[in-house]
Amino acid sequence: MTTVPIDNIRNFSIVAHIDHGKSTLADRLIQITGGMSDREMAGKEQVLDSMDIERERGITIKAQTVRLNYRAKDGKDYIFNLMDTPGHVDFAYEVSRSLAACEGSLLVVDASQGVEAQTLANVYHALDAGHEIVPVLNKVDLPAAEPDKVKQQIEDVIGLDASDAVMISAKTGLGVPDVLEAIVTRLPPPKGDRGATLKALLVDSWYDVYLGVVVLVRVVDGVMKKGQRIRMMGTGAAYDVERVGFFTPKMTAVDELGPGEIGFITAAIKEVADTRVGDTITDDRKPITEMLPGFKPAIPVVFCGLFPVDADDFETLRAAMGKLRLNDASFSFEMETSAALGFGFRCGFLGLLHLEIIQERLSREFDLNLIATAPSVIYKMKLNDGSEIEIHNPVDMPDVVKIAEIEEPWIEATILTPDEYLGSVLKLCQDRRGNQKELTYVGARAMVKYDLPLNEVVFDFYDRLKSVSKGYASFDYHLTDYKPADLVKMQILVNAEPVDALSMLVHRTRAEGRGRAMVEKMKELIPPHMFVIPIQAAIGGKIIARETVRALRKDVTAKCYGGDITRKRKLLEKQKEGKKKMRQFGKVDIPQEAFIAALKVDS
């Protein structure tokens, strides 16, 4: 295979909000450059979204890559490396890795919907990575498309000159050849020194049953060849390279990858944990001293417990999580036991969509039936003895008398909404203890910035936002800092026994409402037993809400015909004693639905 000069390589990513046509544009680029024949493309959409769940939800979760060959109008042959990045806020880490491997971005905006909140976040990521950005307006063939208005919006909101934005319809292929020319003329080539020591960026890694761990790399300097001994600078692990190649989107083997090229390697790596995303790869025999800048390990933001409904599935769940961890560096888990739910795992996620997707993948790919406990965030606690601790599980909270102060994480949220729903959106943010920072208008849409406690967002904020705005509002957030908060630990007691899986940290002002809603829900779903079951919500020793499940009535006097009243009384007293004893020692069966419903309660 002939080596293409570095000036003829273009590494670019496509940045867009969910559902603005990013993966469809990628399909067209692959088709036009001959990456896949029309026959192979037939009946296939979103070629790069390999997971079913990605296609169904219309979202990209893993960053994908493909190499395309293109002969431009100037008669030269070019190599395009396209990185298809996720668009959702939870996967911002995957976006930042992919962007670091590229020099330019195509900003795809739906001409009928305009700029959305996550478009903004991802564009800022691209600008931070020093990218040249080419605006592309998609879906211009729709009757609702307003390209001029959207161009103006790109200039007003993002501050990019959109006068020469490329107009396309990715679905029909209209204007897509112009995108290819714009990539050649408007995006810069990579820089790199072929003669230098190997320096490469680890962009992503996943597990393949036959090949072991497949590592996606972007070579910065030097050459990566078969048989070479490489070292991961972050973990210090060394390996011999077995295969080198790239995706077209099919795996294609080559002898070496030069500077500026993006491809994959395999090296008999058993654990994806050894290949930290964002790590620097170098030659083991003459390593470089400085790592590539700007990468940090992904830090989980939202935590929740996952427990198998059937206790026998515990080992299957452990193996399944291990497999998902292979493909998802940002998912973490540790073992946890719960008196109510048995053995399970405490898992850390990047955000709520990430949590939902992991849950769905566990149930789909591994056929597991799971219960998830209430999501929580990391709280910092200053104790009276001067020490500080961090907890993300309410069960680990120390005694109240030992705590001097609790701090909770806050986020800055950017919400874009049509102005007719602004009132409902502001009320929602206000109810969630938000502080409004700014409000600006972009055409007929309002852009609001709010400071909100993350604790209030992880439950159901996104769903509520979509329902108050009829699905039109878009939302993006980033963590800002920790602030002191008046938080209390609320426990749910069933028959005077605390149910650890339902305990949570809530703000004092919201505790009563949430507690009442949870006990009412539990009352509906716990079946009657032979004895009375009190369901209580408590903060410390104080009960803030109570409901009672009535006992089943068993008529012990049925066998007495007439006769002496003392006989009946004796039987009733005996039953009373038995019920009292049963209440002391009896176990209440809490059905799974009761847990799930209590955790989904909206206060």
Swiss-Prot record:
Annotated compartments: Cell inner membrane
Signal peptide bounds: none
Gene it is expressed from: lepA
CDD domains: EF4_III (cd16260), LepA (cd01890), lepA_C (cd03709)
PROSITE patterns listed in its UniProt record: G_TR_1, G_TR_2
Superkingdom of the organism of origin: Bacteria
GO annotation, cellular component aspect: plasma membrane
SUPFAM superfamilies: EF-G C-terminal domain-like, P-loop containing nucleoside triphosphate hydrolases
Topological type in the membrane: Peripheral membrane protein
Record key words, sorted: Cell inner membrane, Cell membrane, GTP-binding, Hydrolase, Membrane, Nucleotide-binding, Protein biosynthesis
Membrane-spanning residues: none
Similarity remark: Belongs to the TRAFAC class translation factor GTPase superfamily. Classic translation factor GTPase family. LepA subfamily.
Domain (tr-type G) ranges: 7-191
Protein name per the record: Elongation factor 4
GO biological process, one term: positive regulation of translation
Binding site for GTP: D19, H20, G21, K22, S23, T24, N138, K139, V140, D141
Catalysed reaction, written as an equation: GTP + H2O = GDP + phosphate + H(+)
InterPro entries linked: EF-4, EFG_III/V, EFG_V-like, EFTu-like_2, G_TR_CS, LepA_C_sf, LepA_CTD, LepA_IV
Enzyme Commission number(s) from the entry: 3.6.5.n1
Residue runs in coiled coils: none
GO molecular function: GTP binding; GTPase activity; guanosine tetraphosphate binding; ribosome binding; translation elongation factor activity
Function: Required for accurate and efficient protein synthesis under certain stress conditions. May act as a fidelity factor of the translation reaction, by catalyzing a one-codon backward translocation of tRNAs on improperly translocated ribosomes. Back-translocation proceeds from a post-translocation (POST) complex to a pre-translocation (PRE) complex, thus giving elongation factor G a second chance to translocate the tRNAs correctly. Binds to ribosomes in a GTP-dependent manner.
